[in-house]
């Protein structure tokens, strides 16, 4: 019989920089998980994605063991990096704070495709384009 899952914890952590300090320590500690083991494994898996925030979904089992799945970085982070801006517009309707090309949009869509509820790159591009528009980033040809 498979192990019983006691909790599912979702965190967004800097790639390669997980440490026992909050938010990791308290979230895992209350379920009795070995925090250092998680930190070492997470850092090893994400060291090639340095500079990005990588969401992680941790499944904690009743024997205090765990498994985790890393997701792709949030679309907003990928868009701000591609546009070369620090953050999106507070008021997206008033004006553009940056631009990204269709090629950059397609690259972001291909990166995010496994985590999006889409089956094709074209539909993923529409989802990412909507996110960019809401951030005040315009798409250029």
From Swiss-Prot:
Q: What is this protein called?
A: Large ribosomal subunit protein uL11
Report the family membership. Answer: Belongs to the universal ribosomal protein uL11 family.
Q: Which InterPro entries match?
A: Ribosomal_uL11, Ribosomal_uL11_bac-typ, Ribosomal_uL11_C, Ribosomal_uL11_C_sf, Ribosomal_uL11_CS, Ribosomal_uL11_N, Ribosomal_uL11_N_sf
The major lineage groups are: Bacteria, Bacillati, Cyanobacteriota, Cyanophyceae, Synechococcales
Stated role = Forms part of the ribosomal stalk which helps the ribosome interact with GTP-bound translation factors.
| PROSITE patterns assigned to the protein according to its UniProt record, in alphabetical order | RIBOSOMAL_L11
The organism named in the record is Prochlorococcus marinus (strain MIT 9301)
- What happens to this protein after translation, modification-wise? One or more lysine residues are methylated.
Q: Which Gene3D superfamilies match?
A: Ribosomal protein L11, C-terminal domain, Ribosomal protein L11/L12, N-terminal domain
SMART domains on file: RL11
Looking at the UniProt entry, the stretches that span the membrane are: none
Question: What are this entry's molecular-function GO terms?
Answer: large ribosomal subunit rRNA binding; structural constituent of ribosome
Its keywords, alphabetically, are: Methylation, Ribonucleoprotein, Ribosomal protein, RNA-binding, rRNA-binding
Any keyword Protein biosynthesis? no
Q: Which PANTHER family match?
A: 60S RIBOSOMAL PROTEIN L12, LARGE RIBOSOMAL SUBUNIT PROTEIN UL11M
């Amino acid at each position: 019989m498979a192990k019983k899952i006691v909790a599912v914890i979702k965190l967004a952590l800097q790639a390669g920089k997980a440490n026992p300090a909050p938010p990791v320590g308290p979230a895992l500690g209350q379920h009795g998980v070995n925090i250092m083991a998680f930190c070492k494994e997470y850092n090893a898996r994400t060291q090639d994605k340095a500079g990005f925030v990588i969401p992680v979904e941790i499944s904690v089992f009743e024997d205090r063991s765990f498994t985790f799945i890393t997701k792709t970085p949030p679309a907003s982070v990928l868009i701000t990096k591609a546009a070369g801006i620090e953050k999106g517009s507070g008021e997206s309707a008033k004006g553009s704070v940056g631009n990204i090309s269709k090629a950059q949009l397609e690259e972001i869509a291909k990166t995010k495709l496994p985590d999006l509820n889409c089956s094709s790159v074209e539909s993923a591009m529409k989802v990412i384009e909507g996110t960019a528009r809401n951030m005040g980033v315009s798409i250029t040809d």
